[in-house]
Amino acid sequence: MAADAKNLIWIDLEMTGLEPEVDRILEIATLVTDQDLNILAQGPVIAIHQSDEVLAAMDDWNQQHHGASGLIERVRSSQYTEADAIAQTIDFLSLHVPKGVSPMCGNSVGQDRRFLNKYMRELEDFFHYRNIDVSTIKELVKRWDPEVMKGFKKQGTHQALLDIQESIAELQFYRDKVFKI
């Protein structure tokens, strides 16, 4: 399949916390969909090695959730660096989407973009400057038509690939129930 400018890149990061000045990326996953939100390809799911010092500095919430999911152990045993993750992810994305055309898609992608800008600038530059942020739609629906929210429940696994799949399903739900397209 040739790279298609209409395809969308979906991304999720798991991090040690919310502040890129002190926290680090633990995991990255990407998916590519067509413009109708059909999944075309799954990119590499990469746990990025971080030092024991970085992992120990995580707050209780992150320790609990990333520990329960097994991510902390995957990060400890990983041989992948941030540079490896950048290269593998760009290699994958280049097969499906030309550089600079896809918005960054996902939930709370502004947060992901902050971390990419700090630690994976070359990957952040692969995206268009625009975002398709499912969180924005969710926040509007919660305020304007809260009954609709009862129809979609997130699992909240805090595993990058599963979170992306859930973001796509959530946008499909809003497309069908809110936008009625």
UniProtKB/Swiss-Prot annotation:
Does this UniProt record's set of keywords contain ATP-binding? Answer: no
Broad class of where this protein is predominantly found: cytoplasm
SMART domains in the cross-refs:
EXOIII
Entry keyword set = Cytoplasm, Exonuclease, Hydrolase, Nuclease
An example Pfam family from this entry, by short name, is RNase_T
Q: Where is the active site?
A: Y129
EC number(s) given by UniProt = 3.1.15.-
- Signal sequence bounds: none
Per the record, its GO cellular-component terms are: cytoplasm
Protein's cellular compartments:
Cytoplasm
Q: Which GO terms describe its molecular function?
A: 3'-5'-RNA exonuclease activity; nucleic acid binding
Q: Where is the Exonuclease domain?
A: 8-171
Q: Which InterPro entries match?
A: Exonuclease_RNaseT/DNA_pol3, Oligoribonuclease, RNaseH-like_sf, RNaseH_sf
Does this UniProt record's set of keywords contain Hydrolase?
yes
One of the GO BP terms on file: DNA metabolic process
**Classification via CDD domains:** Orn (cd06135)
Q: Which domain of life is it from?
A: Bacteria
> Would you identify the family this protein belongs to, as annotated?
Belongs to the oligoribonuclease family.
What does this protein's UniProt record list under function? 3'-to-5' exoribonuclease specific for small oligoribonucleotides.
Recorded protein name is: Oligoribonuclease
